[in-house]
């Protein structure tokens, strides 16, 4: 179970400029700054950005990229997603997965009957939620920890959670 290797994965979003020398504030979608630094080069709407420096900030991280040298350039990046290709993410143990790998997988009930396809993974604070779209295009959500059994090529949804 792996998403397309060239699919872009958003690791952070630029939330604004920091100072006058081109640094940007980031909202990270990963907790590990060391791993974020290891990627080195990110895509910002198709433009490569080379990470020079990263430090913590009360609202996320502050980063400096080689290509961004002043506040105007930094401000222009506000709202820009910083992405890497899926193939750049490290391999995981057999019993772990990235949420991106769940999206697009067929969902079935315990008997193997098709329910729909997974379309999103969300977290509203109480745990991870899988959103499933049925054939009639109606959607419903299930808690991943209690209701989803992950297989390489499909997801089995516990009967009690199927709408």
UniProtKB/Swiss-Prot annotation:
GO molecular function, one term: ribosome binding
Subcellular location: Cytoplasm
Main location as per UniProt: cytoplasm
GO terms of biological process kind: ribosomal small subunit biogenesis; rRNA processing
All residue ranges annotated as the PRC barrel domain in the record: 94-162
GO cellular component: cytoplasm; ribosome
Assigned keywords, A-Z: Chaperone, Cytoplasm, Ribosome biogenesis, rRNA processing
A family per Pfam: PRC_RimM
Key word rRNA processing present: yes
Family under the similarity heading: Belongs to the RimM family.
SUBUNIT field: Binds ribosomal protein uS19.
Its biological purpose: An accessory protein needed during the final step in the assembly of 30S ribosomal subunit, possibly for assembly of the head region. Essential for efficient processing of 16S rRNA. May be needed both before and after RbfA during the maturation of 16S rRNA. It has affinity for free ribosomal 30S subunits but not for 70S ribosomes.
NCBIfam families: 16S_RimM
Note on domains (UniProt): The PRC barrel domain binds ribosomal protein uS19.
Protein name stated in the entry: Ribosome maturation factor RimM
Native species: Zymomonas mobilis subsp. mobilis (strain ATCC 31821 / ZM4 / CP4)
